[in-house]
Each structure stands twice: as C-alpha cells, then as structure tokens.
C-alpha cells in the first residue's frame, strides 16, 4: 500500500505503478478499489514536512490494523516518523514548509524533495529488478496498460 499527497503523492504513485509493472500486488490508499489493510501488509507513506494530519491518521489506523509503516520524509522530527513509523527513510532535501536542517534549494516549494523521491524510488525499482532472477524490463512491460 502507498500513500502521499500533492506532487509527493504523484512521485509515490509512480513508484506504485512500477511495483505493479513488476507483478507486485500494490494499492493506492485513495482508490475506491483498495482492499482492507492488515497483518503482514506494508504501508509506504511519503510526507515531506512530516506534518500532514490526514496521512498521520491513516498511518495510525493502518498500524492499529497490524500493518508495518514505512515513512519517507524530509523531516524525521514529524509526528508520523517519531510516533507511528516502523522505519523512517530520511531524504535530506528541502520540502514545502519544511523546518529541518536539509539541503537547501532555490527551486520553489518542495521541488527538490519531490525530485529526490522519484530518483530514490527508481533506484529501489532497479535494485529489485537486478536482484530478482528472471525479472526483466521486457517482462515488466507486459503489465503496462494496453488500452491507451
């Protein structure tokens, strides 16, 4: 399961799409067809500034249901990272409304964090492909939507 909002959410949704291309069962929390979450499930949440209330709420509910919570953030001092997450992945890049000591950027708002998310997620995908015998980009492309 994945969750994010705004442009951070778009980067996270792109990650979910690639996981689906790999044949993984993946659900975007906001979709109406998302099943219940529970024991043995993983929720990956992106929240740049660490203070997105409704994402914190969903992470708390998922944790209560038995899911593991991984948080990718530019602000590890946020409530979700400190109080809910099982694992925190700190991306030290400027985020929208961020307050932590991170790599500054002249780009507007949270661009640097969003760009770093996309690169991080692509590296994770490439690593999984490299470490999965028989998984190729050609096989992944067979799971690409074919009604475009």
Model-inferred region functions:
Residues 2-119, 126:
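Glycine-rich phosphate-binding loops that contact phosphosugars or nucleotide phosphates
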Residues 123, 129-148:
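A short, charged, Gly/Pro-tolerant segment at domain boundaries
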């Amino acid at each position: 399961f994945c969750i994010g909002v705004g442009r951070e959410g778009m980067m996270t949704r792109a990650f979910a799409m690639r996981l689906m291309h790999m044949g993984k069962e993946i659900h975007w929390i906001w979709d109406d067809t998302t099943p219940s979450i529970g024991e043995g499930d993983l929720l990956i949440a992106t929240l740049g500034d660490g203070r997105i209330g409704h994402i914190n709420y969903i992470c708390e509910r998922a944790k209560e249901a038995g899911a593991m919570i991984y948080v990718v953030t530019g602000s590890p001092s946020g409530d979700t990272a400190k109080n809910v997450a099982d694992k925190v992945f700190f991306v030290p890049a400027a985020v929208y409304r961020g307050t932590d000591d991170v790599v500054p950027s002249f780009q507007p708002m949270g661009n640097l964090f969003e760009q770093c998310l996309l690169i991080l997620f692509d590296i994770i995908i490439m690593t999984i492909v490299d470490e999965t015998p028989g998984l190729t980009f050609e096989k992944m492309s067979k799971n690409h939507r074919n009604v475009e």
